[in-house]
Amino acid sequence: MTPLSETEKNLGKSKHSGGRRFMAKAVASISALATLAGGMALGAVTAPAAFAANGPTTSYDRTLGNAQFEAARESNGLSKEMDYGAILHAWMWSANTIKAHMDEIADAGYTSIQTVPISTIKGPVEGMQFTENWYYVYQPSGTGIGNKVIGTEQEIKEMTAEAHKHGIRVIADAVINHFTADWNAIQGDWKNSSFFHTRQEGGCGDNGTAINYSNRWQVTHCHLLSLWDLNTENQEVANRMKDYLTRAVADGIDGFRYDAAKHIELPNEFDRYSPYYDTILPNGAQYQYGEVLQGDQGLNAPAYPALLQVLDEWRR
């Protein structure tokens, strides 16, 4: 087994005593880095499992509904409910690195592992280290699976299968509000202007990027940090994103953390019904949570938990 890096050593270890496991301390504020979104916050939520191969079943079927998974989970003293267990935020870890240290992760008492976004992304600027462009993981170029950070789709499948052998579930960060700001980097099957809000649609200044956070229409229709804002009222866009999430679940993902969730309108928030959340959330995952930072005038924050649970970053 390869030695742990200094960052990975922060994982910590736990000890057994009388059959009880004392959890390693929970992941701290690393997750605050996890989004570029103009209201940075974390959202809470809800989650797949099998061993020989991950198939197109639900997360529950492959984990809590799987006798082998349950035996491993109970043996490692891990929480049955993901809400009550510690989550290891494996920030910028590859699937292979996570897989190589699964024994330590289980021994430390982590119920779940959260990965970086697993979709295809904009590549780093030529000549620059990827660590200087960490935010590219929040700039999808399409809805394929696999990128320079997490690794290939096959490596993700192997990592989730290994996690399930240890009774651990896997949450993937998911960017479902926008794509990269670089139109040329967007993959061909997504290069359709109807799939994105126009730069003028939200009524924002500065080519659609100057968002008034007291105006919910602008928050949900303008282009956050110039990122191409998905037309989430478009049923085909919703169907495509649902297909991506369902495929990720089939690859062994148990849950999702939805980046910039407050930048996506609620189903009946405006005059025109938005099918987005109603379409994408029934994807077979067991645990889903959204990033919703309170504080914006006009934000109906309590309405989001009706769709998925929300953990706020409270302003002090």
Ranges and model annotations:
Residues 1-23:
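Terminal targeting segments of Actinobacterial cell-envelope proteins
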Residues 21-40:
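Sec-dependent N-terminal signal peptides
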Residues 37-59:
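C-terminal region of N-terminal signal peptides and the immediate post-cleavage residues
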Residues 54-86, 97-110, 116-140, 155-172, ...:
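Active-site-proximal helices and loops of the catalytic beta/alpha 8
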Residues 81-85, 121-161, 192-229:
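Aromatic- and acidic-residue-enriched carbohydrate-binding clefts of CAZyme catalytic domains
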Residues 86-96, 226-239:
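Active-site mouth loops of central-metabolism enzymes
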Residues 148, 152, 233-237, 269, ...:
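Residue-level preference for long, well-ordered alpha-helices that form the structural scaffold
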Residues 183-192:
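Flexible, glycine-rich active-site loops centered on histidine and acidic residues
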